[in-house]
């Protein structure tokens, strides 16, 4: 017997609508579960306004790369933040790669990750909170991208405090502030170059960096907190010619010119008032020590005079030039 088409009554239509709704809910759940198992198994996270914050890590460690997006309910949501303490005390973590989608790294995110040796920070990060790499003592080098404006926020432990294996820090051109305690007890750090953008450095930022020998500033002298270089007895601060607000000491350390420029004028060589001399030109107010010896085969250099290049120029004359068959000169800055 052939059956004709079934006519839906209002009751049947309600049943069909309910079934469609349930199907949509089931489909959403399936899409959520469709997020790659390897990714879901490694991270816990929250969502807010279409963006994801990584809040924890449950993976096996080793080399970890954060995803830049996650598919949630059929939507690709960007990973924009790493929450506070998200990877704290994860002893199995060896390296971490942070994608360009991440804009901020929360307090203590990698606190006490004692086997962390390599960090790649994406070009989207603008701020790094306090304590992020606290006591990551196997971390040896780090590059801070140009996008970062602040290293720490003066709310807790320093960003790199007690990273005792850290030997090299490369700061991007966007960094304006370095918070207190930022590099405290980085005992292997031997030098650091600060970009022109740096305008403030917090208290004790480089305290107990016992291997530190040179701190190089490309810009003007920044404002500082107290005891910036406490315990850094072998360090010297260097600043570039033409920058401002520098005096003979900075943060308790001697401050001297970095890459000073000096030259002599061949046309000025000659005898004046029975003394041989020449004009020295170079960086304004640079102090120059003129040394002399009598031969280059076995040179014994002795200071003859100390000149200050007031206005960028000074004339040197040798009162002893007639006492030797030959007098050879060199210049140095104290």
What role is predicted for each listed range?
Residues 231:
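Basic phosphate/pyrophosphate-binding loop/patch that engages nucleotide-derived ligands
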Residues 84-86, 106-111, 129-134, 156-161, ...:
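Consensus positions within tandem repeat domains that build extended binding/scaffold surfaces
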Residues 21-24, 28-31, 35-56, 217-220, ...:
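Short, composition-biased motifs enriched in small/polar/acidic residues
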Residues 47-49, 61-81, 91-104, 113-127, ...:
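Structural signature of tandem-repeat unit edges
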């Amino acid at each position: 017997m052939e059956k004709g088409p079934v006519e839906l009554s209002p009751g049947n239509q309600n049943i069909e609508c309910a079934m469609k709704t349930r199907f949509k809910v089931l489909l959403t759940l399936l899409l959520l579960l469709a997020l790659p198992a390897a990714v879901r198994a490694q991270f816990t996270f929250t969502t807010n306004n279409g963006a994801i914050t990584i809040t924890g890590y449950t993976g096996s460690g080793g080399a970890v790369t954060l995803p830049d997006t996650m598919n949630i309910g059929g939507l690709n949501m960007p990973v924009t933040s790493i929450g506070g303490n998200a990877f704290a005390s994860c002893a199995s973590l060896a390296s971490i790669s942070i994608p360009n989608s991440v804009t901020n790294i929360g307090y203590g995110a990698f606190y006490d990750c004692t086997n962390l040796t390599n960090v790649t920070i994406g070009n989207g990060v603008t701020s790094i909170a306090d304590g992020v790499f606290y006591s990551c003592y196997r971390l040896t080098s780090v590059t801070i991208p140009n996008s970062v404006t602040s290293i720490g926020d003066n709310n807790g432990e320093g960003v790199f405090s007690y990273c005792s294996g850290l030997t090299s820090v490369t700061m991007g051109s966007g960094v304006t502030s370095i918070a207190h305690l930022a590099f405290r007890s980085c005992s292997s750090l031997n030098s650091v170059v600060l970009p022109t953008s740096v305008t403030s450095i917090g208290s004790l930022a480089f305290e107990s960096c016992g291997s530190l020998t040179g701190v190089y500033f490309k810009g003007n002298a920044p404002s500082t907190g107290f005891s910036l270089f406490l315990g850094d007895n072998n360090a010297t601060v260097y600043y570039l010619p033409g920058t401002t607000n520098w005096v003979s000491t900075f943060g308790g350390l001697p401050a001297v010119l970095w890459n000073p420029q000096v030259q002599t004028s061949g046309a000025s060589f000659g005898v004046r008032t029975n003394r041989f001399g020449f004009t020295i030109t170079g960086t304004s107010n640079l102090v120059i020590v003129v040394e002399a010896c009598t031969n280059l085969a076995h040179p014994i250099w002795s200071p003859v005079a100390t000149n200050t290049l007031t206005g960028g120029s000074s004339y040197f004359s040798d009162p002893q030039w007639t006492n030797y068959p030959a007098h050879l000169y060199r210049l140095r800055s104290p």
